[in-house]
Amino acid sequence: MTTTDRAGLPEAGVAAVAAAPAPARRPRRELVAATVGSVVEAYDWTIYGILAPYFAEALFPGTSPTAKLIAAYLGFALGFLVRPLGSVLIGRLTDTRGRRYGLTLTVGLIAAGSLFLAVVPGYASIGLAAPLLVVGARLVQGLSVGAENPSVAAYVTETAPAGRRYFYSAVSYGGVVLGSALSFIVMNVLLGVFGESGVEDGAWRYGFVFGGLLGLTALWIRRGAAESAVFTAAAGKAAQGAALPAGAGAAEPEAAGPGGKAPEVKAPSPWPVLRAHLGRLAVVFAITSGATTAFYFVTVDFPSYAESAGAATKEETSAALLLGMVALLAAMLGGGKAADRLGALPVLRFGFAGLALGSVPLLLAMNAGRVPVAVVTVVLLFLLGLPLAVSNVFAGQLFPPAVRAVAVGLPTAAAISLFGGTFPMLAELLRSAGHNAWLPWWPALTAAVALAASWAVHEHPGHPGHPGHPGHPGREHPVSVTPHA
């Protein structure tokens, strides 16, 4: 008996895909190609934010340093707003021209944007053209970042070896942690070499030069990676009027070799398929909302929250975040390994349940002086690392290859824009109104919604991908959506 999603779509073909022989490939090279782009994406996004106080004076107009800094952060916010558009435009190219095409395009545009910011003339030289060019570069980078994560999700879903798909997901997403850490390292080097005045006088440009060179390195690596075998198979099937089912992963015919050109899929509009998968899109949106709200609360707003609550200074909380990042990365790698044995949903649900039920009590205990800020930071980031470890590939398996990048990207980018991009503003509004104590309830609530949404899907024990099935070939976990009574 086949299962169906809420739109009544049959969950067919999963067993055949799971049981097919794996192709001879070099999955570690493909993993590096996926991960290096995540490093570039995170570095680019973080370095702009931490360098903004240093370049705002040179590039933006305003009657005061504060006004110039706000204008610089406006460019940051606009980049968030165009992410959903990028997930559709570039994601569509990823679904029709190949995963490698999308991966090289996104990282190439990010690199170009960084190099452009490194050389853009100042406001004193070209007037209003300077901030307009900066905002234009951020819009291009926002479009690229909107498609980067779903393109990686599609690529890892389809290229990771049997039994290691979620671990590969964790490693590739771990590039975000490494990229963020790298941006702070570069910032400290610039301050150590040039001092604050030197960075303000133009040394900030070296941060973008490094980002551009990092992006070009990632572009070179990705151009040499193999195309997804699933995409290659989908292109051939599309030419014959067939299609691969949702859940199709690594077990497909031989991929296009490194540097080889993938066949283009002459696919129809993705919108009819997406409309038929509205339930799955909602699940991805909810899961991403829960993860991104917690991420921005702990990694961006937490120092201000703890200081306002009288629990710790910003310096103490920032130091605790370094230890928390280690816990985050450890949880992601451990969670990925656990998901390959147990399935993604137990790992994802454990993390969200901990955030939903434990965030508020833990933070109240911290505010009362009963729990150190370092312990709270480590626990929250460890819990967050579990859903982050598996969410990319988990979402990728919900959709057929023909629309996978767009289907993952659209709800993901929308959730990040709505819940991540707005969280710092929401936090400041609540604090200014004297309601700092309300803040922990927001990530707890979104985590609870994500946990509830996860029960709309399950790893069906009747599929060979479930570890309890006697025909289980390598601990793969195809996902089906069922109408729970």
List each language-model region with its residue ranges.
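Extracytoplasmic gate region of multi-pass secondary transporters
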Residues: 49, 277-327, 420-423
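Extracellular/periplasmic helix-loop-helix junction of adjacent transmembrane segments
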Residues: 52-85
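Cytoplasmic membrane-interface "Motif A"-like loop-to-helix N-cap segments
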Residues: 96-107, 341-352
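C-terminal ends and interior cores of transmembrane alpha-helices
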Residues: 108-126, 353-368
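Glycine-rich segments within core transmembrane alpha-helices of 12-TM secondary carriers
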Residues: 167-191, 412-423
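Multi-pass alpha-helical transporter architecture, strongest
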Residues: 218-225, 444-485
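C-terminal transmembrane helical hairpin of 12-TM major facilitator-type secondary transporters
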Residues: 346-390
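A late C-terminal transmembrane helix in Major Facilitator Superfamily
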Residues: 401-433
